[in-house]
A protein has these predicted regions:
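Conserved active-site and SAM-binding loop architecture
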Residues: 1-179
């Protein structure tokens, strides 16, 4: 979504992931740590997996620390943040990056960009300004919430992928403001 928003504005945008791209466009299927050192990049917007980092999985933190998964995830984020790229944004939900690496530079919500949704998202920035809200929608409850305020997406094999998707209007704001 983010790659496509930048490409739509004429940028030479490339996505990198172990998974294949779900849309047409420039995509490298592989390890981003191998790719970022392969050439000069001017901007990286990274979305590291939140599986071992987000507070939504806090009940499993002891197990993840004991077997090293959490330390490995933090080392990956640190490698992304310290990459030799002048402009970097790292996106992740509220989690342990804030306590183990550093606090986020900004916390955004989809409703700040015209989306009828709530999803507290942290941004760690290097060489980039905070995103400016575009169209703010304030509600007591958003379309993706239950009456108690929880995410209403039912459990499913691809729930992780659906919940991790970047909202289009946030991607558009990144492209117009950082591109």
């Amino acid at each position: 979504v983010v790659r496509d928003a930048f490409a739509k504005l004429g940028h030479n945008a490339v996505s990198v992931d172990f998974l294949p791209s779900e849309t047409e466009g420039k995509h490298i299927q592989g390890d981003v740590l191998d790719v970022i050192g392969s050439r000069q990049w001017d901007l990286m917007i990274a979305f590291p997996p939140c599986t071992h980092l987000a507070v939504s999985g806090a009940r499993y933190f002891a197990e993840k620390r004991a077997d090293g998964r959490q330390q490995e995830a933090l080392a990956f984020v640190e490698a992304l943040l310290t990459a030799d790229i002048p402009k970097i944004a790292i996106e992740n939900p509220v989690g342990i990056i804030s306590t183990h690496i550093r606090k986020p530079d900004q916390i955004i919500q989809p409703w700040m960009f015209g989306e009828d949704a709530s999803k507290k998202t942290c941004l760690w920035l290097k060489g980039l300004p905070p995103l400016m809200a575009t169209t703010v929608i304030k509600k007591k409850r958003y379309a993706n919430q239950t009456p108690s305020g929880q995410n209403k997406l039912a459990p499913s094999p691809d729930r992780w992928k659906i919940r991790s998707k970047t909202y289009q209007k946030i991607a558009d704001a990144m492209a117009t403001q950082w591109g």
